[in-house]
Regions:
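N-terminal juxtadomain amphipathic helix
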Residues: 2-80, 234
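Conserved class I S-adenosyl-L-methionine
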Residues: 99-109
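A short glycine-rich, Lys/Arg-flanked "PGG" loop and its adjoining helix->strand segment in the class I
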Residues: 172-187
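Conserved SAM-binding loop of SAM-dependent methyltransferases across substrates and taxa
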Residues: 110-120
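Short, glycine-/aromatic-enriched active-site segment of Class I SAM-dependent methyltransferases
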Residues: 190-212, 216-218, 223
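A conserved beta-strand element that flanks and buttresses the S-adenosyl-L-methionine
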Residues: 160
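Flexible, glycine-/basic-rich loop-and-beta segments that form/coincide
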Residues: 240-285
Length: 352
């Protein structure tokens, strides 16, 4: 089955869900085409909100094999993110408060984050389903090419999961498997991106691999269901502002978690009106963009995009604004066409 409807909240388990934003049926954001007319499948791209914990999630989940078995995103190719991974390795080791011996990185991609941990003397283990990346990630680390499920077994001091946790259609099962593989005094570090998406009226990071958008309350309730405790939350500017959730099996939640939830409450994150306004603001933003594009087209200008990113495809397919071309410096994308909107991708040499 390629499509599954998410009928209950993936965080707290309740079935009280309210539609927030409908981005129409769209193809997978990274499914670039060799020709304009190449057949492609489209799937619903809508987000719902849980009325109990305000967790935001996709209305439907696409079969992960269609997305991850051949994954084009490679984490170690941008200097900004490589520098961040250096900081992250130091941060994780310092928060452990002792001398960690081993780390498991779930969704380890090309192994770049594991490289940083190995340089600090840790035994390194990884899990990732991308067959095309396994040769890279397994060069210096013990990496299982597949999904992190109940069959995986490797006891470690630290478990990290950067951004991939929100890709998981069964997060409770995921955390239970973490608990099974974690040493008694171990820690879990889960990073989720776009923590301010709703408050900032952002929708371009909504695509089929991003199933969940966690707030602090929804993550706390999910941890509690798994018999774990959320013990701290740190905000970091990477990926449009991310949360790093620090989770323990043997430490109780400190008072500051309630204070952090109170801050989200004060910002309006648990207010129904916030989500009504968010939906309308996103629609209004697109309409204003379309008006500007139409104005410049009428003046004889071409409409050219820069960067054939997944988030650009969400925007293109929702707005239906016709672009003449998109410039991208990645030679692997040049000569291809964007999914859905079928815009040709070219190199920056066309500017000459």
């Amino acid at each position: 089955m390629d499509l599954t409807e998410n009928k209950v909240c993936l965080a707290c388990g309740y079935d009280e869900l309210t539609p927030v934003l409908d981005l129409n049926d769209q193809p997978l954001a990274n499914s670039y085409k060799k020709s304009k007319d190449e057949p492609e499948a489209s799937y619903p791209l809508n987000i719902n909100r849980c009325n109990v914990c305000c967790h935001v999630q996709l209305s439907h989940t696409v079969n992960p094999d269609l997305i991850y078995k051949n994954y084009l995103y490679v984490s170690g190719t941008t200097k900004t993110y490589v520098d961040y991974m250096d900081w992250y390795a130091d941060f994780v080791c310092e928060r452990f408060n002792m001398f960690p011996q081993s780390v498991l990185d779930i969704g380890c991609n090309d192994g770049s984050q594991l490289d940083k941990f190995k340089a600090r003397g840790l035994e390194t283990y990884g899990v990732d389903p991308a067959i095309n990346l396994w040769e890279l990630s397994s060069k210096n680390h013990q990496v299982h090419c597949g999904y992190f499920d109940k069959h995986f077994s490797q006891s470690v001091d630290i478990i990290t999961c950067q951004n991939a946790f929100a890709h998981n259609p069964r997060p409770l099962e995921f955390l239970l498997n973490c608990k099974k593989n974690l040493e008694i005094d171990g820690l879990i570090f889960i990073q989720t991106s776009q923590s301010d998406m709703i408050l900032n009226n952002e929708f371009d990071t909504i695509y089929h691999e991003h199933i969940s958008f966690y707030n602090i309350k929804s993550m706390m309730l999910l941890c509690n269901r798994a018999g774990l405790n959320l013990i701290d939350v740190v905000k970091t500017p990477i990926h449009g502002t991310s949360y790093i959730f620090i989770i323990s099996a043997d430490k109780s939640a400190p008072a500051n978690i309630k204070n952090l939830i109170d801050m989200e409450t004060a910002a309006g994150l648990y207010d129904t009106k916030t989500y009504i306004d968010y939906s309308q603001n996103c629609i209004d933003m697109v309409e204003k963009f379309k008006e500007k594009v139409e104005y410049w087209r009428n003046q004889g200008y071409k409409v050219v995009g820069y960067g054939a990113a997944a988030k650009a495809n969400t925007f293109l397919n929702f707005s239906k604004v016709p672009f003449d071309m998109i410039i991208d410096d990645n030679p692997m994308k040049q000569g291809l066409f964007t999914p859905g909107s079928s815009v040709g991708i070219v190199g920056s040499d066309v500017l000459n």
